[in-house]
Regions:
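Cytosolic catalytic headpiece
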Residues: 1-12, 16-20, 62, 84-87, ...
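Alpha-helical transmembrane segments of multi-pass membrane proteins
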Residues: 100-104, 176-183, 211-218, 245-252
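Multi-pass alpha-helical transmembrane bundle typical of ion/small-solute transporters
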Residues: 121, 206-207, 238-241
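Hydrophobic alpha-helical transmembrane segments in multi-pass integral membrane proteins
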Residues: 152-156, 210-226
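Cytoplasmic-side transmembrane-helix entry/capping segments in multi-pass membrane proteins
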Residues: 196-205
Length: 263
């Protein structure tokens, strides 16, 4: 990947042939500006560095949002597929799935799109121009997250099923949403989530508070419980929900550590 800067007529051929031609906005000639891909408005080379940093941040956030959306939806598919194959009653009803997809998936994904840049973002090698999004490492991460999410929700369903189908669905519903909160922190960083600034994304935290509030409203208010076909949980069942949800983060971080050590 080669970038070329120039401001004169004689620079036009090089600007045209470079992967990214950068012309000077103040001192550059019209010919150089026409030949370039980018015009540097302030003629400050430091702006190029900031532009590269911002471009990498946008690309990273796009990847994280896609990974989160696909992982959560595949996790739901794993849950429903296992239920069908094992001839269980449906672990989640259509209205519950609708709430999970519209509230639990979409809002956190939007918040990820405005996440801050990773600490090592400028020390990485550039992405190949012809490289697609669905690379082998990316596909592996999605599959891993989906299996983890599907596994903990299946566990919640089986535990709740010992009491009643209503309890099973309520626990599955809660674990599916709360697990996404913990999973999103693992997705934010390719390294350990402890290395990232935990409270740096205010939009993400605002989204988590909003989604958690709406979820608790649906689960605790009798009228909303009736609408969403949920039931009240005991304190022990709530602790199980919390433990399984945190288990997603623990398993995800362990898998990342294992992958880094192998690499």
């Amino acid at each position: 990947m080669l970038s070329m800067t120039g401001d004169g007529v004689n620079d036009a051929p090089a600007l045209k042939l470079a992967n990214i031609g950068v012309a000077m906005g103040i001192t550059g000639t019209d010919v150089s500006k026409e030949a370039a891909d980018v015009v540097l408005a302030d003629d400050n080379f430091a702006t190029i560095v900031q532009s590269v940093r911002e471009g990498r941040r946008i690309y990273d956030n796009l990847i994280k949002s896609i990974q989160f959306m696909i992982s959560t939806n595949l996790g739901e598919i794993v849950l429903l597929l296992v239920a069908v194959l094992c001839n269980f009653e449906m672990p989640l009803l259509p209205i519950q799935l609708l709430f999970i997809n519209l509230v639990g998936d979409s809002l956190p994904s939007l918040a990820l799109s405005v996440d801050h840049a990773a600490k090592n973002i400028m020390s990485r090698k550039p992405v190949e121009p012809n490289q697609g999004i669905f690379t082998k490492p990316f596909t592996t991460r999605i599959t891993r997250q989906a299996l983890i999410l599907g596994g903990v929700t299946i566990a919640a369903y089986l535990i709740g099923l010992q009491h009643s189908i209503e309890v099973a669905r309520t626990m599955t519903f809660a674990v599916m949403i709360f697990s996404q909160f913990t999973m999103i922190f693992s997705i934010r960083s390719g390294n350990s989530w402890f290395t990232e600034r935990f409270f740096s994304n205010r939009w993400l935290w605002a989204t988590i508070v909003l989604v958690m509030g709406l979820t608790l409203l649906v689960m605790l208010v009798p009228a909303m419980q009736s609408l969403f076909k949920l039931t009240a949980l005991t304190s022990i069942q709530w602790w199980i929900v919390a433990g399984l949800s945190l288990g997603v983060l623990v398993l995800s971080e362990f898998c990342k550590l294992f992958t880094r050590n192998n690499n």
